C-alpha cells in the first residue's frame, strides 16, 4: 500500500489525500484496509507535522529514509523556525529499525541527532 501527499493506495483502490500523513485514527483505518486486502507492506510519507502532532506515535517503521531538508515548512501554521522543523523531521529516526540517510545533505547531523536506528 501507499500513504502519501497525493493519495493513498490500497490494492486497486485510490483515495485522494487531505494531508500528507493522515490523523492517527485514519492511518489505522488505512492499515486495516490494507491488511484486509492482503497487503503486507506499506510505503508511507511521514510529514514533520505528523511527527510533531504525534500522528504516528507508537509505530515502529522497518525503514526510514531521509532525502533532504529545505526551509519550506516554516510559518505560523507549521514550524516556528528551521531548528524546530529539523527536530521534528529527526523524530522519525527514533521510530525506525533501519535508517537510510542522504550523506550529502548539509543538515544530516541535525537529522541524525538522537536517532536510534
What are the roles of these predicted feature ranges?
Residues 14-24, 72-80:
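Flexible beta-alpha connector loops of hexameric P-loop NTPases
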Residues 30, 34-35, 45:
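Switch I (G2) and immediately adjacent beta-strands of P-loop GTPase domains
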Residues 1-10:
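Short beta-strand-centered segment that lines the nucleotide-binding/catalytic pocket of NTP-utilizing
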Residues 39-49:
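Switch II (G3) loop of P-loop NTPases
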Residues 36-37, 63-117:
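Acidic, Mg2+-coordinating active-site environments of NTP-dependent enzymes
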Residues 50-57:
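Conserved helix/coil segment N-terminal to the catalytic DExD/H
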Amino acid at each position: 500500500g501507499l500513504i502519501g501527499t497525493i493519495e493513498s493506495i490500497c490494492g486497486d483502490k485510490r483515495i485522494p489525500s487531505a494531508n500528507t500523513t493522515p490523523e492517527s485514527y485514519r492511518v489505522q483505518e488505512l492499515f486495516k484496509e490494507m491488511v484486509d486486502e492482503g497487503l503486507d507492506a506499506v510505503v508511507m510519507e511521514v510529514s514533520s507535522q505528523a511527527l510533531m502532532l504525534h500522528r504516528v506515535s507508537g509505530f515502529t517503521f522497518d525503514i526510514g529514509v531521509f532525502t533532504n531538508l529545505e526551509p519550506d515548512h516554516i510559518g505560523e501554521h507549521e514550524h516556528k523556525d528551521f531548528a524546530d522543523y529539523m527536530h521534528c523531521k529527526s523524530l522519525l529516526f527514533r521510530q525506525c529499525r533501519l535508517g537510510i540517510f542522504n550523506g550529502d545533505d548539509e543538515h544530516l547531523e541535525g537529522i541524525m541527532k538522537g536517532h536510534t536506528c
